From Swiss-Prot:
Residues 1-24 are annotated as: Disordered. Residues 72-74 are annotated as: Interaction with phosphoinositide-3 kinase. Residues 99-121, 299-310, 783-792, 857-908, 961-975 are extracellular. Belongs to the cation transport ATPase (P-type) (TC 3.A.3) family. Type IIC subfamily. The lineage of its organism: Eukaryota, Metazoa, Chordata, Craniata, Vertebrata. Mg(2+) binds at D707, D711. Its EC number is 7.2.2.13. The keyword Protease does not apply. GO terms for biological process: cell communication by electrical coupling involved in cardiac conduction; cellular response to amyloid-beta; cellular response to steroid hormone stimulus; intracellular potassium ion homeostasis; intracellular sodium ion homeostasis; neuron projection maintenance; potassium ion import across plasma membrane; proton transmembrane transport. This is Sodium/potassium-transporting ATPase subunit alpha-3. PROSITE patterns: ATPASE_E1_E2.
Amino acid sequence: MGDKKDDKDSPKKNKGKERRDLDDLKKEVAMTEHKMSVEEVCRKYNTDCVQGLTHSKAQEILARDGPNALTPPPTTPEWVKFCRQLFGGFSILLWIGAILCFLAYGIQAGTEDDPSGDNLYLGIVLAAVVIITGCFSYYQEAKSSKIMESFKNMVPQQALVIREGEKMQVNAEEVVVGDLVEIKGGDRVPADLRIISAHGCKVDNSSLTGESEPQTRSPDCTHDNPLETRNITFFSTNCVEGTARGVVVATGDRTVMGRIATLASGLEVGKTPIAIEIEHFIQLITGVAVFLGVSFFILSLILGYTWLEAVIFLIGIIVANVPEGLLATVTVCLTLTAKRMARKNCLVKNLEAVETLGSTSTICSDKTGTLTQNRMTVAHMWFDNQIHEADTTEDQSGTSFDKSSHTWVALSHIAGLCNRAVFKGGQDNIPVLKRDVAGDASESALLKCIELSSGSVKLMRERNKKVAEIPFNSTNKYQLSIHETEDPNDNRYLLVMKGAPERILDRCSTILLQGKEQPLDEEMKEAFQNAYLELGGLGERVLGFCHYYLPEEQFPKGFAFDCDDVNFTTDNLCFVGLMSMIDPPRAAVPDAVGKCRSAGIKVIMVTGDHPITAKAIAKGVGIISEGNETVEDIAARLNIPVSQVNPRDAKACVIHGTDLKDFTSEQIDEILQNHTEIVFARTSPQQKLIIVEGCQRQGAIVAVTGDGVNDSPALKKADIGVAMGIAGSDVSKQAADMILLDDNFASIVTGVEEGRLIFDNLKKSIAYTLTSNIPEITPFLLFIMANIPLPLGTITILCIDLGTDMVPAISLAYEAAESDIMKRQPRNPRTDKLVNERLISMAYGQIGMIQALGGFFSYFVILAENGFLPGNLVGIRLNWDDRTVNDLEDSYGQQWTYEQRKVVEFTCHTAFFVSIVVVQWADLIICKTRRNSVFQQGMKNKILIFGLFEETALAAFLSYCPGMDVALRMYPLKPSWWFCAFPYSFLIFVYDEIRKLILRRNPGGWVEKETYY
């Protein structure tokens, strides 16, 4: 027995344990290996930094730790997903309706000799509707796939390890902690490594940290934070160039990447706002249905009906309240919007996300590639003692500078020659900016800049043959090459050098001005310093350039230059200029950020890049708007230390990841509340997640954009995750709800607009659909209370809900926005509901009642024309429905057989049905707008006009088509009977136009409080 009890507790324990694990994962990467010496690391992992592990030891560790692979998360089986579509949300209501119908039919079959099949048909139709719409939604969602499969592709297949002193290739899954691993340019890193030796090694950490530049790797600890230090490389990042050797310090799920994967797959994801809305709506409708059903159940018992009859009535009323067509309408509306968004480059993976974007109140955007173009571009040059601006626009429509200066010719020569980047082959017809380059980001920026301004770099390099080169390294921070010159009369070699500006300047004694060498004096050094600070302050990456003609007597033609043991001068060179690069903002972004601001959406930048660069881009795209200052700006302006500035004075703030690490939840909340414009720089993946959770604590609906693996936890946690289609890693695409096919932030704004529009239009669609519920229910209620012949049958109700109302309801999804949707605040999910009490009151209490009157008017007209005046109908029901009574007298004394009476009754059903169609014309037109007059909005919605014609044609077809009297018990009507409901239709239109006029004249008045849904 004891065991059983423990089992009971374990799910709870597991839940708690899972939550603790997730909290651990949210903490920063705890790693100490980067601070240890190589010997300490080897001691800790019982390995040798020359020989590596022994084979037996490696096997032992592999058995202990398991393979070096990521654990796939539990996936939801397809059948469960299918069942969710069949039994989730709205479908439940229809299922209950169907079961009740079968129940009622069962009761009737058991108690009557000749039961009517209406309830059976209704049950079957309801079940069919749910199954068909369920399949449709399942198909839509099945197009999106699972999160982890992309992680699988990230595991490198082979790794080069050293065991017992021998190099060997092993499967990456067999790499264990303590293994000695070698990596070279082009390899994927097989595990987290502590570097013990490196030669020109650079890794691309962009998918992990968001840094666009390749990062140098060396054995020294350069930073306390393991993500920033140079002596650790991470599992599944790429080695771009050079070689390195390191000791494995973590494998599989314990690696930094593994933690992110676990974090992303373990996050609790809340319901989408629209799912919450639909749930709220179902509760409302069910409430109304049950209330009506129970009231009339009690009433019918008081009126003397038997228990069985009362139960049949109860079921009938509940079923009549179910809007059968609405599930399909909502699904189709969302699908249409998703298709429309796909045409505008937003691919929506899950249908409900379509609307989420519309209710978004905060967007946390990644910088690289989303707000920027994701290509380093030369932005400024400094030569001849002035700063020149380069063209950073995507289509080269920007500024140009004076290219005739001799200094620029020299500068472009250095930038083209002292550069290892080359265009990949076969791209001659492609525009320069679009070409692929082999080389790092800065060098390819220089290459493209020189190619655009000075013509072919390839030709330049062929004419000035390279004879020697020292590649860039982190100790001397420059790159140098020596070339023969193209001038046939000049036999001197040309030495060209580029690198960190202050290091380059230290090696120079002269400076080139207007093509003449001048001595480098203090004044020029100060000018250099100012230019360097100005460009650096713009968040740009600055490089210095210098050259030197080697004297011919010392370095004759054919001189053997030795780059290891340098046998030529590298001092007293001639400084030529600076060039600075930035990843420039995309053209459409500032406008998009402005639109977000006027739509009441807060845009927060979250990036792994440097604070200065982040701030510069934030100002460039308007995330920090003109005139808004950060604490640092205020301190600089007033010339006081930052600590003396009151943080409340600053509207904008730039927060560094290392500071964020020590913040409590309360401090984060305070920042989010008190600043309107926020930039988070140098953030880790875990911090991104913490920022998203902070915004959600404020009650915001958060959209997150990202492209790297590091973004996936935040993408998953956000209310809507938006991944990049071009630059995005597979992982981020899997975690997201929506993918921007053109990687452009501006597409998000389009998405917000579409999301807000669909919310408005769904409201209209639902208002339209629900209104016809009243003329469908009231006949049944009067049938019970006044004992009159049934005015409208079950089959006819289905013809309205699944026939005539469908196309018009869907056509409202195509309705254009009434006012500028993007000028209002985001909706508050707590107060602005999809279906609120006011909508129910309008649809049921006002418009619906007028519609019911129209239907009853036709009903009484037809019966009166046939001889049954309204006064004689009350209490006639029992005789009317009695098969044995074949001599029922009307108001004029004529006798009617059972069959004849039924023909008149079914003709009334048809007329009532047609009346509902006629009054629904007016309802459709008034539902086009919620505040504007229809005359302001116009009738531009072609689908809606088609819907009007379609429902009329369908009604006429059902009434006049031969054979319908048998199939659906619909009978042909006299043309004059079509016009009975016209006055009511007109009344609805006039009533609503007057209501909207009052709304517009008295905004916020009682009419708005009572009727504006």
